[in-house]
Amino acid sequence: MQTRATGLSKQESSRDFSKKLLKLAVAGGAAFWVTDFLMAVSPIAAAYKAAFSFSSLPVALVEALAGGMVIAFSVSFFLLRFISRLPGKNPIFKALILSFSAMVIIEVLSALGDPAHAFTYLVLDTGMNIPRILALGWTIGFVFDKQNRKV
């Protein structure tokens, strides 16, 4: 039988996990979105928008925000949950491993979605996603390291 103190301790632990998850995900999603915005106003973005049929910059930015938050929540959850099982000692490196793993999954699913143009989409999409995923992973790892640093 659980005591009330054990129940409160689990509740506190769950609340602490949720707070950390939210902070990491918001930071990572914001880094993803800022990187996407900077790329969207660059000259190379015109070819990318044409290839993926993005007609409106605001719509593309909203989609990037939603996608970045989903990826950031996923990476943050797995980093918090499985930090000790991931290779390496540095949390930034561990977050980058998770981020690039997510990118590989996304790229495979994108290629399966349109097999006729899979190679073109794979090259363009991977090239455009590397800076976004790099920013997301580095930021999540950095914030995680800051949260858990012993002073």
What are these regions (language model features)?
Residues Q2-V151:
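Juxtamembrane/disordered regions of integral membrane proteins
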